[in-house]
Amino acid sequence: MTLHFDFDEGSQGFVAGFADYPPAHEEIYELTSGHRALPPPLESQSGLFISGVNRSDDLFMFFKGSIDGLTPGASYGVEVSVEIATSTPAGCFGVGGAPGESVWIKAGVTAEEPVAVMEDSYLRMNIDIGSQSSSGTQAVVLGNVANSRPCEQSREWELKALESESTPAGITVADDGRVWLLMGADSGFESRTEVYFTRAAVTLTPSPAG
């Protein structure tokens, strides 16, 4: 079973969230999100926009949406893919890491709703998304936000398709028949990142345990 999400048509029920930052100082992170038209030359399309300024060595910016109507107790293997729009060129240097190659796009499907919870003075994800370039058991690295343009050229927004990957862990559907698709940007670049999520796809393959 493969499900496709086209965010040109609207938010599809997806909502934004942020983690790996201290909420007491949220204003300096300049966290922004919403469904909006893409910048030129892609202005004929729309997508889910998310942006923030990484000031803490790490910042996770994400969207989540529910997938309903599954059989409770069924088990599945998970493959995910996304398409993004990015204006970040390749091969640049930046504080903490490259603005393109050190911002990793991750996605996964979970039975538990992914939320940011307080841990000491920071908000952390309640699921295992891994850390920066490393996948977690519940979210896999699909690529980064660097586009095809070299750093020496002027910035231009481009679409970038990130190929499907399997998450390390499968899922078992909860009693409510609902699972959650998570897609986000895990930043090691200590400045502003802006990215649009334009499409996503999820393939659920019944596993022997189901």
Residue locations for each model-derived region?
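Short beta-strands within extracellular/lumenal beta-sheet-rich domains
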Residues: 55-71, 160-168, 197
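Beta-strand-rich interaction/scaffold domains
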Residues: 104-151
